[in-house]
Amino acid sequence: MEQCLGQLKEKVKLNEIKSISFSGHMHGATCIDKDHKVIRPCILWNDTRSRQECNDIMNDKSVMDIAGNIAMPGFTAPKVLWLKNNEFENFELIHKVLLPKDYLRFYLTGEFFSDLSDASGTYWLDIEKRNWSNKLLEASFMNISQMPNICEGTDQTGVIKKDIAEKYDLNINCKVFGGAGDLSLIHISEPTRPLD
């Protein structure tokens, strides 16, 4: 955070920023405990250690209808199931699972939110209902209380906490919005070009 805001401070007055939003790599499992401390380093999107856990989740073929996809090692749910199978002492401590950008949001606001684009890459989202699926959560021995709230990318999810505003000289009224996963934003930010 210090590096990012330090670079931004060279271009703008931080206390004049009125709103912040995020993008970040999708699928990462940032697990925090009841004291809101990170339990272990985030398992990143490109980590493939959870292949067996994908097979375990896919034993019930109906999960594909809910998630709209097959379970892949890059997704969050298989990573967390891997924790249960291989680092049970860490798995037992999980209070919330946040995606990387959503951990930054929590740090700045104290609020637990994830936008729909990032939530869709967890393998816990019912894509039709646009909400967490109890069935998908149960497949990795999780429950809805361990999930952040779901929001649209354009929804306001909080304001900067007072201690954070003071620490970084940010506007105490600075609004924080949902944002989106990196792949989703690539699709909407890439200029369209005529076909040759």
State the predicted function of each range.
Residues Q52-D56, S189:
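Pocket-flanking alpha-helical
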Residues D33-D35, L108-E111, R193:
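Short acidic-glycine loop/turn motifs at beta-strand connectors
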Residues M1-P41, D65, L93, A165-E166, ...:
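N-terminal glycine/serine-rich phosphate-binding loop of ATP-dependent small-molecule kinases
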